[in-house]
Amino acid sequence: MVDQFARTQVQFGPDGMQRLYQARVAVFGVGGVGGYAVEALVRSGVGTLDLIDDDKVCLTNLNRQIIATYETMGEYKVDAFARRIASINPEAVVHPRRIFFGPQTADQFDFRQYDYVIDAIDTVSAKVELAVRAQEAGVPIISSMGAGNKLDPTAFEVTDLYKTSVCPLARAMRTLCRKRGIRQLKVVYSREQPTTGAAPAAGRLDTDREGPGKRQSPGSNAFV
C-alpha cells in the first residue's frame, strides 16, 4: 500500500520522516498566517500539533483563512482545525486550546514539551511574551510580522528581527524585545511598504475579536 507521505519521503528520507512524525509543534494563532502553517505541517507528516487560539471563524475570515468556510462559521478555529487535521492524517495528535496567549496566560503553558514554536499572533505584547518564554525554554521559534495591507508575495523573507525594516509591527517588536533582553529572533517579514487601501471596506471590518480596544482591521488577501 502506498503511504500518504511517500512523495515527501523522497525528499526528506526515512529518518527525516521519522523526525517529523516524532515532532511536536505549537502554533500560536491559527488565522490567516497560522492556518496555512498548520496545513503545511500536517501534510508534511508532523505527528503532534498544539493549536492555540480563542477566536471563532467569522465572515471576514473567508477572504484568506484556509479554515474559514460557511460550514465552519461560528466555530472555534482550533476545533475546526482539529477536525480538518483528522481528515488529512487521522494518526496526527492534535491538542486544541481555546485560549488567548498573553502575559496573563503564559504560565499555563509548558514550553519544554514543544520541539518548535510558530508565532502567528497579531498582538505585540503576546508576541514578545511568546518569544521570551520559548527562548527561556530553549525552544526554536519563528515569529510572523505584519502582512496586512501588503500585495507582493515575493517581498517576504526570513531574517533576524533586528535586520528588518519598513514593517510597523517589526518596529514595535524591536523596541519591546530589547527591553526584555531578546537579542535575536527569527522572523518572516515583508520588505514591501504597506498600502493605504484602494477603497473603504463595505461594512464593519473588525469582527474577529469583540470587546474594548477594537481597531480597524487592515486590508488582506489570500495570496499574501
Task: List where the protein language model places each region.
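Conserved N-terminal Rossmann-fold NAD(P)-binding element of oxidoreductases
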Residues: V27-G29, I52
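Conserved SAM/SAH-binding loop
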Residues: R97-A106
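N-terminal charged helix/coil linker that caps or initiates catalytic domains
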Residues: M1-A26
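Glycine-rich phosphate-binding loop and adjoining beta1-alpha1-beta2 segment
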Residues: V46, L51-N89
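Hydrophobic/small residue at the entry helix of a nucleotide-binding pocket
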Residues: V33-G34
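Glycine-rich phosphate/adenylate-binding loop
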Residues: F109-Q113, S125-E129, E136, I141, ...
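Short, well-ordered coil/turn residues at beta-beta hairpins
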Residues: A120-I121, S144
